[in-house]
Amino acid sequence: MAMKKSGLLLLLVIAVASCNNRKDIPDVSDIKVILAVNRFDQAFFEMDTTGIDKSINELNRKYPEFLAPFLQTIVGVNDHAGIKSFFRLYKPIFDSSQKIYKNFDPVKNDLEQAFRYVKFYFPSYNPPAQILPVVGPMNSIEDMAKMANGDFTPNFIGPDFLGISLQFYLGKDFSLYKTEYFINNVAPLYRSRRFEREYIAAEVMKLIADDLFPDKSNTMPLIERMIEKGKQWWLIDKFLPETHDSIKTGYTQKQLEWCEENEGLIWSYIIKNENLHTVDPVTIQTYIGEGPFTQGFSQESSPGNLGPWIGWQIVKKFAANSPELKPGEIMNTSPKQILEQAKYKPK
């Protein structure tokens, strides 16, 4: 028994070491980042709704730049009756969120570390002045994607704030996520399995990457779009070097291993069966869109959204061939140039 325990411990040590064995992780310990967290979620759901006028006025004094956009744009209400209705409907969701996020320090610490890497690579970039945890409506995954240029993220950036939508991070086994209505109308199980705290920093960094280098790939052909998305993933990897790739990609560990083991076959299939320069929306959705798997590949092992992963590998190859380029220069390189100079030929 002792030998078995020792063996398990050794495997654990090796696994942990392998996650932190990257040579390209810079030392950011001297970079000062302190994020201000203002608990809008608590202020809103702990207000006295019997005196709604007074409560809303107090909230508006405390959050003058945020309350109106939250109510009108995010929640979609314009009067006190609508506010009360939203309050009653989502108060149980808020109560559930407090069991996990009453202490927000673990999330704050994750974000501060990520922003240290952001500041290392982009010293002039200023993190949001305040982090605002919220509990908002359970919009559909399609609505969320429209808000984020095609990428699902429930979070949002304002002029001086970053909103974290806690209703989408209550744990994959949260009872509401398992209901038929939620699965069919909000997020299927392959997506809600990522509704965990560990994914918050990765999904926030998607917003930051897009804030730094807005994704303009919507009208591009397939291969260029894959590479543009891959550039975003490459940059997120720079911001989260200590985070496992399964978190950054949203793939399961099994799906990630399948990609790594079949990289050459994936690329061969795509160049053989697809026009890399097509703008056909169905083809693009096959490789860029969310899904339980990618059509044409293993339903048991392949992930959806496979195109950005291939794009990421192409960008990594290009970056390795161009060590003189800084991250900002790589991000500003056209996908055509990246494809040409990467000389991507996986085995």
What are these language model-derived features?
Residues 20-91:
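N-terminal mature-domain "stem" immediately C-terminal to a signal peptide or N-terminal signal-anchor/transmembrane
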